[in-house]
From Swiss-Prot:
CDD domains: DSRM_RNAse_III_family, RIBOc. The keyword Cell wall biogenesis/degradation does not apply. One of its GO terms (biological process) is tRNA processing. Its EC number is 3.1.26.3. NCBIfam families: RNaseIII. The gene is rnc. This is Ribonuclease 3. Pfam families: dsrm, Ribonucleas_3_3.
C-alpha cells in the first residue's frame, strides 16, 4: 500500500508510521488496537494547506485585492476541491477503516476523503518539512489556482443563489455544538433547506463550519438531481 500511494503522490515517507496514521479512520481505533487516527494530522494539514494556498495565490495574482484572494482561497480549500483532489489520487481505497464504515460506503464518503487528504498533508509536513508539503500541494492545486481568472463565489453564496432559483426558502444555519478548549474550539453547524436532509459540518470557527455545511448541502442537491 505504501509503495502504491507513494508513486501516486510522488512522495516517499521516511517514517511510514506517519502515513499509516494519516490513513487510519477513527472507526478503526479502539482501546485495544491503534492509538492514533488521522484527526490530529487533519488539524495540522488544514493549517498547512491554508498557508500554502495563501502564498500560492499571493504570488500568482500580484494585482489582486485581499478580497479577491480570499474568495479564491475559499474555493481552493473548500470541501468540493478537497474531494476532487482526493478522488484524483484514489485516496479512498487507501483509507483503513472498520468493516462497518466500509459497508456504509466509507471509502467514497466525502467527509472521509476531505479529512484523510488534510491528514496526508499534515503527515508529509511532519515527515519532510514545509517544502515537501508545499511541493505536494502545488502538484495538485497549482493548475486550478493559475486558471482562476474570475474570483469564485463561496459555497454559502452558491447555495443561496441555487435555492433562490428553486424558489425555496433561504438556507437556515444553526450552531448546535461548540467543543474543545477556548484557544482551539470546534464548532458544529447544521444547515437546513426544505425537501432536503439537514447537513452538519464542523470547523475551527463558525464561518468555516457554515461553509463546509453549505458545500455538503450542494453535493446533496446535485446528487439528488442526477
Amino acid at each position: 500500500m505504501i509503495e502504491s500511494i507513494s508513486k501516486i503522490i510522488k512522495y516517499n515517507f521516511k517514517n511510514p508510521q506517519l502515513l499509516n496514521e494519516a490513513l487510519t479512520h477513527p472507526s478503526l481505533v479502539s482501546k485495544d488496537t491503534l492509538k492514533f487516527n488521522y484527526e490530529r494530522l487533519e488539524f495540522l494539514g488544514d493549517a498547512v494547506l491554508n498557508i500554502v494556498i495563501s502564498e500560492m495565490l499571493f504570488n500568482i495574482f500580484p494585482k489582486d485585492t485581499e478580497g479577491n484572494l480570499a474568495k479564491k482561497k475559499t474555493a481552493l480549500v473548500c470541501g468540493n476541491k478537497l474531494v476532487e483532489v482526493a478522488q484524483s489520487i484514489n485516496l479512498g481505497q487507501f483509507i483503513m477503516m472498520s468493516d462497518g464504515e466500509r459497508a456504509c460506503g466509507g471509502i467514497n464518503n466525502f467527509r472521509n476523503l476531505e479529512n484523510a487528504l488534510e491528514a496526508l498533508i499534515g503527515a508529509i509536513y511532519l515527515d519532510g518539512g514545509f517544502t515537501a508539503a508545499q511541493d505536494f500541494i502545488y502538484l495538485f492545486w497549482e493548475h486550478s489556482a493559475t486558471h482562476m481568472n474570475v474570483p469564485p463565489q463561496d459555497a454559502k453564496t452558491i447555495l443561496q443563489e441555487l435555492v433562490q432559483g428553486k424558489r425555496l426558502p433561504a438556507p437556515a444555519y444553526h450552531t448546535i455544538d461548540k467543543s474543545g478548549p477556548d484557544h482551539n474550539p470546534t464548532f458544529t453547524v447544521e444547515v437546513r433547506i426544505p425537501s432536503y436532509q439537514a447537513i452538519q459540518a464542523t470547523g475551527h470557527n463558525k464561518k468555516l463550519a457554515e461553509q463546509k455545511a453549505a458545500s455538503l448541502m450542494l453535493n446533496q442537491i446535485h446528487n439528488k438531481t442526477k
